[in-house]
């Protein structure tokens, strides 16, 4: 029975975005939950940029207030603290991951604004479930609406106005962010997503299109995209039932996906990419969750280099859950890219990485 309870707890925490949050306050229609994790881990790799201590901690809260029987206000904030920096470096590399607030109108959906996940990640999240790696062929932080990003206004509707269980859709607008780094900038854009889940099976699709900033267009080079618009479309399938998790996604991007780095340390932006991800996992009752995945991103029309693989690896890993709060993991990223003139020019890593760690979460 105890082993079965561990499996149920693990399944629940994997399904929930915020794991086992501690309820700080719940009175008179106001609720505040605190959550966090300490992720103690080390990478082993011949790539000096990847090898070493990667420890960090995260802390966040989720709050909501019942305004009336039809209207609820909510907000969420999440911050990451690096644990592999010297004390003299202070908060260098620490970051705000999420910060948004919104209103939920009963069955009519919710609206929020701030730093949040782009709607394209509604599909990308299905394969971003590996013990440590994964979700890196096209879902990227601060790259338009493919991952966590800033200045997004999002409308979400669950169960299609309460009429069709499992049918969800979202619409999103992102305002212009013109930053120093062209690869993290974006113009005005919009995105759409829709998913349907029934008895463990899920199918979904997403699309987003944005203007590119003048600096992004002007940065065009042999390896940098020159298009005026950035686009992504993605589709996914998944099965999540009976302790089995299977998921696959396919996507294409235009003038969006970043890779490698130039002499100044800035990432290149590919003209076009075709991306495939697939993952399979099984949750044993005694807490072990083995995982295997394959991921590939092919860059198209990369100047004089033509078509090149940007990402390709097999991932083999496992997580062992002592209980819902404590786990340990190992994750082996078997890089299938070979050294070439392209990987050297674009500084694309071809080395394997092994990650091991302990994770405490509440």
Curated annotation (Swiss-Prot):
Keyword Signal assigned: yes
UniProt gene name: ompD
Keywords from the named record: Cell outer membrane, Ion transport, Membrane, Porin, Signal, Transmembrane, Transmembrane beta strand, Transport
Membrane spanning stretches: none
Species for this entry: Salmonella typhimurium (strain 14028s / SGSC 2262)
Subunit structure, interactors included: Homotrimer.
GO molecular function: porin activity
SUPFAM superfamilies xref list: Porins
Protein name per UniProt: Outer membrane porin protein OmpD
